[in-house]
Amino acid sequence: MMDTGCVWDGYFCDFDRNFAIHHASDAAMGAHQRLFDATEAALDILKPGISANDLFSAMDRILRPNQTAQMGSEEVGRYGHGLGIQLTEPPSLTTWDKTVIKAGMALTIEPSISYGDGLTMVAEENLLILDDGVVLLSERAPRDLPIIFVP
């Protein structure tokens, strides 16, 4: 995983990209695809008027089907946050943050998943909320985990 970002004219960006070197296990490929699908679930419902916790729930249903752990346990973290003149700003995409999403907000969608033997993978996209939807500010990560340096 590469977690990176930059500052432009006082505003932050923050995004992750995942890749495998030479080959990827089935578990890693599956985890990456679930992260992509969770991000899609959030993007499908994201518009002004939805709440931060609704976005969390949409992603959590994909990442942890049939699970009941709530935010605040060690098992579940947030799945994104606001972005702007600080790297991490409100709202937090959690079960407890009921902030209503408004046009003009910049957010990260940042689902994470544990897989295999203590491994974690995170995907992160930057986006801007418009009056009628959302525009991605980062180039969308592919659904299939990129493999680099193939022998």
Regions found by a protein language model. Name each.
Residues 1-151:
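Active-site neighborhoods and metal-handling regions in enzymes and metal-associated proteins
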